[in-house]
Amino acid sequence: MKMTVDFEECLKDSPRFRAALEEVEGDVAELELKLDKLVKLCIAMIDTGKAFCLANKQFMNGIRDLAQYSSNDAVVETSLTKFSDSLQEMINFHTILFDQTQRSIKAQLQNFVKEDLRKFKDAKKQFEKVSEEKENALAKNAQVQRNKQHEVEEATNILTATRKCFRHIALDYVLQINVLQSKRRSEILKSMLSFMYAHLAFFHQGYDLFSELGPYMKDLGAQLDRLVVDAAKEKREMEQKHSTIQQKDFSSDDSKLEYNVDAANGIVMEGYLFKRASNAFKTWNRRWFSIQNNQLVYQKKFKDNPTVVVEDLRLCTVKHCEDIERRFCFEVVSPTKSCMLQADSEKLRQAWIKAVQTSIATAYREKGDESEKLDKKSSPSTGSLDSGNESKEKLLKGESALQRVQCVPGNASCCDCGLADPRWASINLGITLCIECSGIHRSLGVHFSKVRSLTLDTWEPELLKLMCELGNDVINRVYEANVEKMGIKKPQPGQRQEKEAYIKAKYVERKFVDKYSVSSSPPEQEKKVVSKDSEEKRLSIPKLGPGDQVRTSIQSSVKSNDSGIQQSSDDGRESLPSTVSANSLYEPEGERQDSSVFLDSKHLNPGLQLYRASYEKNLPKMAEALAHGADVNWANSEENKATPLIQAVLGGSLVTCEFLLQNGANVNQRDVQGRGPLHHATVLGHTGQVCLFLKRGANQHATDEEGKDPLSIAVEAANADIVTLLRLARMNEEMRESEGLYGQPGDETYQDIFRDFSQMASNNPEKLNRFQQDSQKF
């Protein structure tokens, strides 16, 4: 290492040493200025580079937008996408380069300035301080008089100590100078070398990237050459066609008079006609008319849905109109209305009249052929009739979820667009959907619509019955109540954007629901409706006592209650085959009166409407309440804070419970007595509901205010089926906990038993009547 300042000169503290120090200190000060400037320039370069990358990213987004716009042109879309991806890689390479620049230049040089140059400055301060002390000691020693021995001795000692300290610090200072002079070379070169390697990597990555892209660019260049040639050829052809058409326009108008009854697209004739409006001013508007599918329709813009003037051409006639002032008019007359039209010329008028007359004749001929075929099909032989009955019987026996659900009124077509044969369903709404509408429903989120396939998914019996209870007609009466009044047209199949807007407005914004004012009824009336039942309940609800008291209470109520679900003979809904209200456990028979006579459901708030409809097993009213914003977990403070789900349990309907659970009901929400839906279902002996709640994650360890959980209640009531279900669920829960995080979702035996109970509760509820039959023996 070459020394900048000599150690020997340092010990002498000669003028040469002082001059060398002064030169070094000036050099270090200038070095610090240069390094600070370089670091600032590096920071500015990095910031500018980041701004460049940001602008480049925005430019890439513009290229991607252009690629999406060119989705119909595969060559342009593919090329732009590929180029934007490659340029995005270059942006990433730039980002890496700027990061490496920050580490190599900014970080390293800043560290050198802050660490090494700071040590040099600290050493300089110490050296200057000890130099001053040495000068003072020399001056003091020179001033001491010879006859003052004590002072001479003291000054000599101070001078000796100061000189020793000066030499030590001066040597350290010189060492720091020499080390700094040597280190600055390595630090500067190391940072610049790292910076250059970063550039090397950047350009190497760019070279590799464009080497891969090169063949594609060459192919694209060849395609572009062909495109230029093809464009020139097409231009010549179009110029020739333009010249030919121009000559035809001047020579004849016959091309506009053609019509074709057997056209492949079904359009017999089309063109512009003036139509007289039916308003008081009788204004004439020019519209694009066409004869297609035995109908006369018109539209103003291509995107507009055609307006049907005549639905069935067989029912109309066409005639000339010479009694009005305007020329070239003719009238299409149907049994309900007439439409006055005007052509641009007499030839066009004759062509339109002939086209309408020919279409009428064709419609009669086609309809006649169809009727003949239907007559042949509707009169089979006796043998074929029998075989038809047999096949129908087989079909009913092997009935699939799709067939059962599509038999519900309105379910044979999509609920939102009307497309036939829908294969998907929204299970919380109870409607059928086509595949395109189902995709839109999925995008809404499961809190609005839960989509399931009617052909690919497994359907639980209670869910299948729920779908059969509702249906498109029921739901559309709620969610499309004001569609006609608002003049809204349902989207047609294939109109994706229109469908999305319509479905969002229908189910998310609920724009078409018939809004009714909750505040239209005085609060006193609403309170009266609720408080009558609640007052009777407060006077009659017994506490669940131990032992026989519980058994006697339950047995007296269950004599008229089924533990499963079966079809009611009068309205077809699912209900318990009981002769008294399911609330008979809590009220003496005959005390309860139906409070629904006091106020129509439209005058209740949505939460109360849902609450009452849940007990009454009225699914359409429940759907209506939810559409009006009812909270599915609304608690009735007048009736022990019972929820709609608890009311559904008391009402004895498995399907009602399933509907509430599908719409987000909390299976563990409890009333003021600490009883949740599982408690109430256990008390009432509703085995099907207990099975349903356990499958939905009900907490069977929860205790009521008397400290009883559902299992203890079932044991005291000696309900073997419910005890079996609760113990099996508890055992399965313990098995899953012991197996840890990656354990199986459930034991096969457990799943099979619960599946059997679900099937019995929905399809054969009489098999779950054992508890009722046994209780009658006591």
UniProtKB/Swiss-Prot annotation:
Membrane topology, record value: Peripheral membrane protein
Query: What SUPFAM superfamilies does the database record attribute to this sequence?
Result: Ankyrin repeat (SSF48403), ArfGap/RecO-like zinc finger (SSF57863), BAR/IMD domain-like (SSF103657), PH domain-like (SSF50729)
Asked whether the UniProt record includes Zinc-finger among its keywords, one would answer yes
Cite the domain annotation text. Answer: The ANK domains are required for interaction with RAB35.
> PH domain: which residues?
266-361
What's in the GO CC field?
endosome membrane; plasma membrane
**Biased segments, Basic and acidic residues type:** 524-539
Q: How does it assemble?
A: Interacts with RAB35 (GTP-bound form); the interaction is direct and probably recruits ACAP2 to membranes. Interacts with MICALL1; the interaction is indirect through RAB35.
User: By what name is this protein known?
Assistant: Arf-GAP with coiled-coil, ANK repeat and PH domain-containing protein 2
- Phosphotyrosine: modified positions: Y742
Zinc finger (C4-type) stretch: 414-437
What residue spans carry the region label Disordered? Answer: 371-391, 518-596
Q: Which organism is it from?
A: Oryctolagus cuniculus
InterPro entries according to UniProt: ACAP1/2/3-like (IPR045258), AH/BAR_dom_sf (IPR027267), Ankyrin_rpt (IPR002110), Ankyrin_rpt-contain_sf (IPR036770), ARFGAP/RecO (IPR037278), ArfGAP_dom (IPR001164), ArfGAP_dom_sf (IPR038508), BAR_dom (IPR004148)
Q: Which domain of life is it from?
A: Eukaryota
Q: Which UniProt keywords apply?
A: ANK repeat, Cell membrane, Coiled coil, Endosome, GTPase activation, Membrane, Metal-binding, Phosphoprotein, Repeat, Zinc, Zinc-finger
Q: Where is the composition biased (Polar residues)?
A: 379-388, 550-569
Which Pfam family is one of those matched by this entry? PH
How is this chain's activity regulated? GAP activity stimulated by phosphatidylinositol 4,5-bisphosphate (PIP2) and phosphatidic acid.
Subcellular location per UniProt equals: Endosome membrane; Cell membrane
Sequence ranges assigned to domain BAR in this UniProt record:
1-226
Gene Ontology terms for molecular function? GTPase activator activity; zinc ion binding
Q: Where are the ANK repeats?
A: 640-669, 673-702, 706-735
Q: Which residues carry this modification: Phosphoserine?
A: S384, S387, S521, S581, S584, S775
- Start and end of every Arf-GAP domain? 399-520
Functional summary from the UniProt entry = GTPase-activating protein (GAP) for ADP ribosylation factor 6 (ARF6). Doesn't show GAP activity for RAB35.
Q: Name one GO biological process term.
A: endocytic recycling
